[in-house]
């Protein structure tokens, strides 16, 4: 994708767009490194999680909004607004994806517990650890320090996530970024913003 984008921008002689994609490529690499270095880290904070997914995932969405705006000669403020919308949408997308890893449906093709089995600490686990008792915290921590986790371990986590209503908490967390996006979209007329607002809602409600 990046090589094709660079080719098109070279033809269009858009140095600004090329510089941004180069920056995005660097940020994605940083995000991947941060995620790998935080595997099994149950002390990961929600702010650190957001930083990781912003770099690893949301920057791609931001670029998808920003680069076309640059190439079509949009004003600077509109480029900034579109970039922010892309970032917010990317964060929502990843939060929901990580939530569905625990609350998805196998019938829709979602493999349940993949992140847990790989030792990835994502938002559902971060929010769960804020709610559980100290003994429960230590049990969950022990599960993440194991070399291998099994279905019994996953079932324990799933029961605690359900008991503590973590799906609701994750959706509410994602909705914060929906609200941020709607504040930007309200600056535009309904025809321009309506479709994107619908997309925000459907992304939070998606099942797989």
Locations of regions flagged by a protein language model:
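Mobile late-domain/C-terminal helix-loop "cap" segments
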Residues: 139-184
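Short, amphipathic C-terminal "tail helix"
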Residues: 177, 183, 190-208
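Charge-dense, low-complexity intrinsically disordered segments
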Residues: 47, 51, 76, 164, ...
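Mg2+-dependent prenyl diphosphate-binding active-site environment of isoprenoid biosynthetic enzymes
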Residues: 1-139, 176, 201
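Juxtamembrane/membrane-water interface recognition
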Residues: 132, 189-190
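A short structural micro-motif
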Residues: 27-28, 88-89, 146-150, 163-164, ...
